[in-house]
């Protein structure tokens, strides 16, 4: 009988593919925890928005993040640019030293908290969820295998310094590359597997809940193929999980924000990435959801 139960359990595991155990831990009232937030995804998570345009568009932000925000510290593996130490959030932590990502806007929200917050950013421009992170059958792929150990190492480094890290959630800005794949509706299954694995692998540092903030990919009908299918998959996942939130970026639906692409120069417009003010807004919106 026991062997039959074991066999049945194994069959169920094969059928479900990515079901894993995950149980948020209870907070110890005797411990002061240090809040950690994750940023993952592709180029609009890495950040291709040019910071110099904020010198005139948002002088206060430009001055603040040229110097650095001491209340929010970040470490990152961003397009193979690696910062293993936690340093103040500032400009230049994007796709290259001239660009920034959602960490700037998110820091504006996190710095309102009483204590220091930490961001771990693990992103790769052009990366595809279903072929490079986790596929719909539950197979872990190269960027999952790269970034999750990096995140765990950074959490352990906080522990070694006497901190008590608590992973509060993640902002996920990805999906553009997946729009080129066939069977786009499978994005939902892949995302579900990805988050199931991630929460399981980081379970040691998750207390009470894990907020997941997703964002629509830009729907302009030029760069991406049927982006509405990817966005529907994202919305479906968030609708099913009480601690998941989806940022609508089309500016039309209720509660949506309006983002604009990089058309800040006289050069060829960049139809794949957000302009500087839009990236600020995206990061702030993600921050407001992730601290709920």
Please state what every model-predicted region is.
Residues 2-8:
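Sec-dependent signal peptide recognition
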Residues 22-292:
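Cell-envelope and extracellular/periplasmic
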């Amino acid at each position: 009988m026991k062997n039959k139960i074991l066999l049945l359990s194994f069959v169920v595991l094969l059928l479900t593919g990515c079901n894993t155990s995950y149980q948020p831990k209870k907070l110890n009232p005797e411990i002061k925890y240090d809040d950690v937030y994750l940023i993952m995804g592709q180029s609009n998570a890495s950040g291709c928005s040019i910071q110099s345009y904020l010198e005139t568009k948002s002088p206060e932000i430009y001055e603040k993040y040229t110097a650095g925000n001491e209340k929010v510290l970040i470490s990152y593996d961003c397009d193979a640019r690696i910062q293993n130490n936690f340093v103040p959030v500032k400009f230049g932590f994007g796709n290259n030293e001239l660009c920034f990502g959602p960490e700037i806007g998110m820091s504006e929200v996190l710095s309102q908290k009483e204590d220091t917050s930490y961001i771990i950013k693990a992103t790769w421009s052009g990366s595809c969820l279903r072929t490079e992170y986790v596929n719909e059958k539950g197979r872990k792929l190269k960027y999952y295998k790269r970034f999750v150990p990096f995140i765990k190492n950074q959490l352990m480094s906080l522990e070694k310094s006497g901190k008590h890290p608590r992973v509060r959630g993640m902002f996920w800005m990805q999906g553009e590359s997946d729009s080129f794949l066939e069977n786009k509706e499978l994005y939902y299954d892949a995302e579900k597997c990805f988050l199931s694995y991630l929460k399981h692998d980081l379970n040691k540092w998750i207390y009470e809940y894990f907020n997941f903030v997703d964002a629509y990919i830009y729907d302009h009908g030029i760069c991406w193929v049927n982006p509405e299918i990817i966005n529907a998959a994202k919305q479906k996942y968030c609708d099913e999980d009480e601690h998941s939130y989806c940022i609508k970026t089309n500016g039309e639906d209720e509660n949506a924000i309006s983002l604009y692409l990089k058309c800040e120069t006289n050069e060829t417009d960049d139809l794949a990435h957000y302009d500087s003010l839009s990236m600020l807004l995206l990061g702030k919106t993600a921050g407001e959801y992730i601290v709920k």
